[in-house]
Curated annotation (Swiss-Prot):
A zinc finger (unnamed) spans 3-34. The gene is nrdR. This is Transcriptional repressor NrdR. It comes from the Bacteria. Binds 1 zinc ion.
């Protein structure tokens, strides 16, 4: 790594420590040219794909929006916050596993529906009715028969 003080190309690692959470590595470095010390931090960069909405616009992945939608569907249902967080984690893992730069919002909606179906059937029906814009009882009946 280049020294930030003198620009020397090769610095030496004097000390390495991992953070308590294990997600960051702290390194103390020394420059053999100017003998100054400095600290660097290393962490994995996990870039979530951009979300492509139905109208073609793009936005960043926002975990809080998905959590809010799930919590609305799960209102007054016997599902814990930990279960919701675990489901959100699985959705994020699937997003990262796609290795795509962009993901259609419809795909995320389907992932949310699958997770809600596992957590609570009533919440699944609530979410599906809004997500799929149900307009009649027949659509509810078909969805419930598929469960």
């Amino acid at each position: 790594m280049r020294c930030p003080f003198c620009g020397h190309e090769d610095t030496q690692v004097a000390e390495t420590r991992e953070s308590d959470e294990g997600d960051v590595i702290r390194r103390r470095r020394r420059c053999p040219s100017c003998d100054k010390r400095f600290t660097t931090y290393e962490r994995a960069e996990l870039a979530m794909p951009a979300i492509v909405k139905k109208d073609g616009s793009r936005s960043e992945f926002d975990r809080s929006k998905i959590r809010a939608s799930m919590m609305l569907a799960l209102r007054k249902r016997p599902v814990s916050i930990d279960q919701v967080e675990a489901a959100l984690g699985r959705i994020e893992e699937k997003m990262l596993a796609t290795a795509a730069n962009e993901v259609p919002s419809a795909k995320i909606g389907e992932m949310v529906m699958r997770e809600l179906k596992k957590l609570d059937k009533v919440a699944y029906v609530r979410f599906a009715s809004v997500y799929r814009s149900f307009e009649g009882v027949d659509e509810f009946s078909r969805l419930i028969k598929d469960i």
